[in-house]
A protein has these predicted regions:
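Non-transmembrane catalytic domains and loops of membrane-associated enzymes and transporters
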Residues: 1-114, 270-274
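Juxtamembrane C-terminal module of membrane proteins
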Residues: 74-84, 123-274
Length: 274
């Protein structure tokens, strides 16, 4: 009863957006129906085996979310008695994901600006930002493992390395200032000069944006002879999170260019794991 009611021509799901599932959810709630989240639902979904296929899949979803945002821009942050899509909490949650790449770039620009102005506020903002990111990361991983322990045990390496090895190092730097650039070298009788310290500081300030560039390079070289080894290495360095943010950034570009909204599906292999 619900799908025909929210579909097109009263017969099918509305596929005018590349994120037809999100669009259906929005139309369901806007029609006064309640959408209930079922955390233990079993889903048989095909996972892309290559980065470029994952990029293609997620780009379609990301572009669809941008389209949904544009179509229902009048709904966000406008509370209603009919639905909950206008609640401020939902709007903050929605745009914190949709605009995350923009926030990452702006944070890097702001931190570098404060650093060049020799402001002590740069270190405070850096630590607050990355400690918050670390706590969110730990909470998300713990919640995911709790909801699906079997998959969590099978993919524990990917879960731990979701933010990337370098980002984990940056998190350690935020929690323990001076540990990696002063205390650890001192154990080996090495003293790093002020130039290294300044360079390291700049690196950790811009890394949150640089990681997206690294993810794009990993996708770019995957089809080359060196990509067989370099792409997995880069993904573990930069992380799956920055990869998804890079895809979201690509979705901005594609929508601004008014690229063709086609269902560019990935190759199906039909392999069952687990």
């Amino acid at each position: 009863r619900i799908l025909p009611a929210v579909g097109r021509n009263d017969r099918q799901i509305d596929t005018s957006s590349l994120a037809e599932d999100t669009l259906t959810t929005f139309k369901t709630q806007l029609g006064g129906r309640k959408v209930v989240f079922e955390p233990y639902a079993v889903v048989h979904a095909e996972e892309p085996q290559r980065i470029r296929d994952l990029w293609k899949q997620r780009l379609r979803w990301a572009r669809g979310n941008v389209q949904v945002t544009s179509r229902y821009r009048h709904v966000f942050f406008r509370p209603s008695r009919v639905h909950k899509l206008g609640k401020p909490s939902f709007g903050i949650f929605w745009f914190s994901i949709l605009l995350l790449p923009v926030a990452m770039i702006l944070s890097s620009v702001g931190l570098v600006g404060l650093f060049l102005l020799h402001s002590e506020l740069a270190a405070v903002v850096f630590r607050a930002m990355w400690i918050t990111a670390a706590c969110t990361y730990v909470y998300t991983i713990a919640l995911a493992v709790q909801l699906d322990g079997r998959t969590g045990l099978r993919s524990w390496r990917e879960a731990i390395l979701f933010p990337g090895l370098i980002s984990i190092v940056v998190m350690i730097t935020a929690f323990f200032p001076g540990l990696l650039e002063k205390q650890v070298p001192a154990l080996f009788g090495v003293t790093l000069g002020p130039q290294f310290e300044a360079g390291w500081t700049l690196f950790v300030y811009i890394w949150i944006s640089l990681a997206m560039v690294g993810a794009w390079i990993a996708k770019l070289v995957e089809g080359t002879w060196i990509g067989r080894f370099l792409t997995p290495f880069l993904i573990y360095l930069v992380g799956y999170g920055p990869l998804l943010c890079a895809v979201t950034m690509d979705s901005y570009v594609k929508e601004l260019q008014r690229a063709d909204a086609v269902w560019d599906k990935t190759e199906k292999i039909g392999r069952v794991i687990g």
